[in-house]
Amino acid sequence: MIAPPNTYAQWAALLTTFVAGTADEEAVHAMRAGTLVWQSGVAERFTQRLLDALNTRIQKDGDTFSRDLARASAEQDTIAALLAQRRRFRTLYAAADLPALPAATRKETIAAVQTAADRTQESLEASAKTDRTGRMSALVRSHRVNVLETEAFS
């Protein structure tokens, strides 16, 4: 069990754990339960650190997704890759939607994750258009990676 962070140093350590991706569920639960005194200097540094962590995870998770899709040899493998990526994006969404953040900052961090998910979905749909059978397009539309709002981490 990871303790909820209360200081900038504790948040920094937790964000390092989050970026590593080794204990996502515990890390996100701790992040969502954490607090931070929102004062000048700390606020800007923390926001940048959180956005950097989210962007790093978006990149790492995107690389994992690309590998999963490249290895997919059957339809069920493709579906599994799409659903796994949606789960990863939902984890990032939960990490961006922190109760400790002021509304404007929260909106900014959520938007960063949603934009990445939307771009991924758009890219998938564009790539699927080259499939003459239309099956890939149907799979990509049926198993969207950008449907992120969830109560999983509440």
What kind of region is each of these model predictions?
Residues 1-43:
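Leu/Val/Ala/Ile-rich N-terminal alpha-helices, chiefly Sec-type signal peptides and the beginnings
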